[in-house]
């Protein structure tokens, strides 16, 4: 039998596709070739990542996979029959990779070393691998003094494992790579404006500069967030496989754009539609988090959410300052839901009178009054003695 060819998802780290991470790709390529790789292929999927994942995430207001699709393409072009990754057997990434591969090309086989007994019986964890790398003179970014795992792309940098597994301990200050410390961020507030069309950013204005184009806008938002310490989170999350895990995330640009989008929706979106969209957003976020990007349910939910964004046009003014992006104003020329005259406390310029609210309250109170009467009858009055 002829030997089979393997396409490996490789970043040069301990555990590569150009997803916008701050990476010395020439060094990664050199390292891969020295370790025995036949070829190192680096595909730039930044634009796809922004247009197909980040922009829908903003429309969905998601807090929670183009790399997998790119790997399938490379594997076919290079006659590979096996896809491989370095994900551990305890994480979500293994699920994300392999479910995407099944959708894109179910004929490809999978090689997952962290799930092979001959591998995990020899290397119980990252410290064993660090020791092996040192013995073999293999350079890695992790060290015994900084043993946490770090993954990076244009959207965020994530950190886990090592000292972070002790949930009560504060992350080391030198761990964060994507944002400055909010405590030492510049004392100068930075005003900027984000323009939206159909729920996605189309222009960003900051300090006299006008930025257009999805990738360029996201990079500029990343820079605003980086310089002002915006987008750091430290959470304990529930993985798809059933474990809880602590994760720290540097997500500057997406944090800023999501906040601006949420605020604009408050101005232009019907309240009932927004409530339904909020429920769907959770479904979309869960699908992405669990590796279900290439599924009919994700596609269905995303279409529904995009329909809700047809009138989400306008601009949001913000100020970046020491870890936060503060909204200071918003406007839209397409929505008629907000009326300054109708909302004013100083005028009666509206098509109803204050007396009309008496009937509104009476109708709304019918079931609530009956509930209160039932509680009194059951000797469970809602008033405190």
Show the residue positions of the predicted features:
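Nucleotide-activated chemistry modules centered on ATP-dependent adenylation/adenylyltransferase
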Residues: 1-9, 14-385
